[in-house]
């Protein structure tokens, strides 16, 4: 599939086109919403706070996922992977870094909100910066391991995008999967659920809770859970027994996460919405220039 435009096994012409169009819509929606979020942080002084730095980290990670989806969409519409084996490794690495950073940034936001609402103390800049650096360095570390031999990047069933190779299900993949999943999926999910549950217990009855305490955990579980199930199945059974089309479903679901996150963390936040509106408003920009 990387060298020719022949249809991949298990896919028809319309199915390849449909996957490409879905990826394109997901990429453009996620990229546009998260770019607006990033732009509002850069242009609105009120948003330059330690807590909002964590949201900015998430928006950057989700923008990276959307860019990865855009490359996959373009390749799907071309019906081939035009960037060679090195491009496949780079695409897999970039997608894995941003996916892990998105998951861990969501957990960091949950912890930051718990700190803000339940301890009634402001998150310090050095704590927020250290947390963001840890998220990205940790994500880069885990994403680099398949390039070094623990795990491996390869083409997805459609052959027009690259991800962690789960087709063999051997000891190398199994050991990497369980170790990586514990630190980058199970722990962030636990932190997210615990943080919002404690917030709900402490502030839910008082009516002072101003954030959605269920959507973030559901997004992590439903957005990335299908990948976890697919990978787990590859460990315990022959993954080729699953149709190639069904194997592509987790990738399509995961590419929706940036849009959902932008709606929840940015458009669902009154201050961020105001910042986006100020950036888009010609009158506001004119006032800023005359100050």
Curated annotation (Swiss-Prot):
This is RPE-retinal G protein-coupled receptor. It comes from Homo sapiens (Human). It is found in: Membrane. One of its GO terms (molecular function) is G protein-coupled receptor activity. Residues 1-15, 74-91, 152-175, 241-247 are extracellular. The gene is RGR. Belongs to the G-protein coupled receptor 1 family. Opsin subfamily. The modification N6-(retinylidene)lysine is found at residue 255. InterPro entries: GPCR_opsins, GPCR_Rhodpsn, GPCR_Rhodpsn_7TM, Retinal_BS, RPE_GPCR. Keywords: Chromophore, Disease variant, Disulfide bond, G-protein coupled receptor, Glycoprotein, Membrane, Photoreceptor protein, Receptor, Retinal protein, Retinitis pigmentosa, Sensory transduction, Transducer, Transmembrane, Transmembrane helix, Vision. Receptor for all-trans- and 11-cis-retinal. Binds preferentially to the former and may catalyze the isomerization of the chromophore by a retinochrome-like mechanism. It holds the Pfam family 7tm_1. It comes from the Eukaryota. Covalently binds all-trans- and 11-cis-retinal. The chain crosses the membrane at residues 16-36, 53-73, 92-112, 131-151, 176-196, 220-240, 248-268.
